[in-house]
Regions:
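The feature captures the conserved acid-bearing segment of alpha/beta-hydrolase catalytic domains
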Residues: 1-48
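C-terminal catalytic histidine-bearing segment of alpha/beta-hydrolase fold enzymes
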Residues: 40-141
Length: 141
């Protein structure tokens, strides 16, 4: 997706309030940016929900996982994620802008961290998310 163009289809983001792997705040900010630009983007945060809350039988567990949560990147990728003719890129957390591959390649490792991630099924949130997604899909037909 080119973050600077109109989206080809509506998006509905299903976010867990306590997701410590894919943090909800950057997703919410991105959705709000898209919506402010006139795109049909919405989200819902499910209270108490962790990462993978929508799985049926995920028992509570902590995993030591790698992620890139130390940055929040907005990257213009004209032809997809593997196209390195992108630019510019902007880290919303630091305010730093990148205009070439060398700068980008030197910075990205600073975004990486390993942290403990909580996962657990949440039946109530999952059931509501399914209803919300079905309503969203029905609304775009």
């Amino acid at each position: 997706v080119d973050h600077h163009s109109k989206l080809p289809a509506p998006i509905f983001m299903v976010l867990g309030e306590k997701d410590d792997m894919t943090l909800p705040k950057p997703c919410m900010e991105l959705a709000e940016e898209y919506a402010a630009a006139g795109n049909p983007v919405s989200y819902k945060v499910y209270q108490g929900a962790t990462h993978v809350f929508d799985r049926l039988t995920m028992l509570w567990k902590k995993h030591n996982e790698g992620n890139f949560n130390l940055c929040s990147m907005d990257v213009r990728m004209p032809y997809g994620a593997n196209d390195r003719s992108w630019g510019p890129a902007h880290d919303k957390y630091s305010g730093k802008t990148f205009t070439d591959n060398a700068e980008w390649n030197a910075y990205v490792p600073k975004c990486r961290q390993t942290s403990w991630v909580t996962v657990e099924s949440n039946e109530k949130a999952r059931e509501q998310a399914v209803k919300d997604v079905l309503a969203f899909l029905k609304g775009i037909q």
